Amino acid sequence: MNRVRGFEVVVDEKRKTTGEITLPTAGTSRAMAYDFYSTDEWHAAPDAVIKVWTDVKAYMQDDECLILNVRSSMGGKWMLANTQGWIDMDYYSNESNDGNIGIFLKNISGQTQHIEKGERIAQGAFFKFLRADNGNTDVIRTGGFGSTNK
């Protein structure tokens, strides 16, 4: 089978959780985005930021990226701490964390919030992109989360 884009569980030694991992799924046959699930139960005080590791990595083509947003059903209580998550294709299987996707969530509700294990917390959609003629680099990614230019 020719792989184009999709999701896999990260290798065991790079996992951050111990429970069962649910790969992202589309809510319907025509949905644009894929739901990401919480691997653990979480509590967060008002204005607290939590990092939810998914233990999932995404593979895609050279001219694609995966963009993450908080699910609309969580929008009144949570936001992504960096407002949007951008996953480059070279994040997949990087040597630092095997491409483990982490989601920073900030509690914006003004009261303590709870996330259940298995709850859908974010959505990711694959996008094609263009590169500028004079903006390319030969730098190869070696790090994981937040490692570009480090």
Regions found by a protein language model. Give the residues of each.
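DUTPase catalytic domain/fold
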Residues: 1-150
